[in-house]
């Protein structure tokens, strides 16, 4: 059911021995599994901020790729893909695209609202999270709880988040991040297993939010949905230059 690899299954296999679990630490707790680092994965993480393919930071421990399942038979592992996202270009007018996005966003939010407990929203005051609050309000959710994180910096988004909270009459909570992170590191590393750029503030914010709600929505991924950041366009343009350089070198040789 994990089409995009949100919560992958981890596994370790050697000879006729197979272990799997929802976290790598569960596998590492077995005495037959060596605790060795995967230097190649660490190199990828340091350069790309993510690890390609199904590797982890632990040697010989992998995870099942998104939209795939693992078949173990006769001491052999076979990974089979059951889901492949194939985006296609559909011609439509601006208004058609606008209405289509609005409809799909509302449907996505409605799906996530299936819960027996109150639901909160990480509210930055930006377009992504503000849209979630607006959709929840349109869907008739009265008890909306919103949460905003700040760093005691001029760039804090408390003011813009408060405007949205007032507009939709949410129960709004704010928190200033303690910039003394060392005391949090042991728990952060234990729970995450893989370093991420916003891991520390995410962990602290989740702790704060968990005192009020157990389910929370966020606007992460909005930029990627609309072709990513400016740097992606630059890299795409440079790709043609790279191809030209390689071809020139080959012709010269």
Segments from the language model and where they lie:
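An acidic- and aromatic-residue-enriched active-site/binding cleft used to recognize and process polar
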Residues: 3, 149, 221-222, 230-234
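Cysteine-centered catalytic environments shared across enzyme families
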Residues: 1-190
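Short C-terminal domain-edge/linker segments immediately following a structured domain
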Residues: 51, 100, 176-180, 203-207, ...
């Amino acid at each position: 059911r994990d089409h995009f690899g949100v919560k992958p299954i981890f596994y370790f296999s050697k000879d006729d021995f197979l272990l799997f679990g929802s976290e790598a630490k569960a596998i590492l707790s077995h005495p037959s599994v060596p605790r060795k680092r995967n230097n190649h994965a660490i190199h990828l993480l340091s350069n790309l901020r993510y690890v390609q393919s199904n590797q982890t930071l632990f040697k010989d421990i992998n995870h099942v790729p998104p939209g795939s399942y693992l078949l173990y038979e006769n001491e052999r592992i076979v990974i089979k893909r059951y889901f492949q996202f194939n985006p296609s270009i559909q011609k439509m007018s601006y208004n058609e695209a606008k209405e289509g996005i609005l409809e799909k966003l509302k449907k996505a939010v409605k799906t996530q609202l299936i819960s027996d407990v109150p639901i909160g929203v990480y509210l930055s005051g930006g377009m992504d999270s503000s849209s979630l609050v607006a959709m929840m309000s349109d869907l008739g959710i009265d008890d909306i709880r919103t949460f905003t994180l700040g760093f005691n910096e001029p760039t804090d988004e408390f003011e813009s988040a408060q405007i949205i909270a007032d507009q939709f009459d949410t129960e709004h909570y704010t928190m200033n991040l303690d910039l003394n992170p060392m005391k949090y590191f042991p728990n952060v590393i234990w729970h995450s297993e893989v370093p991420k750029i916003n891991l520390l503030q995410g962990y602290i914010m989740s702790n704060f939010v968990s005192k009020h709600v157990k389910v929370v929505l966020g606007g992460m991924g909005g930029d990627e949905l609309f072709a990513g950041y400016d740097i992606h366009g630059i890299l795409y343009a440079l790709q043609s230059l790279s191809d030209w350089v390689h071809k020139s070198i080959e012709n010269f040789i």
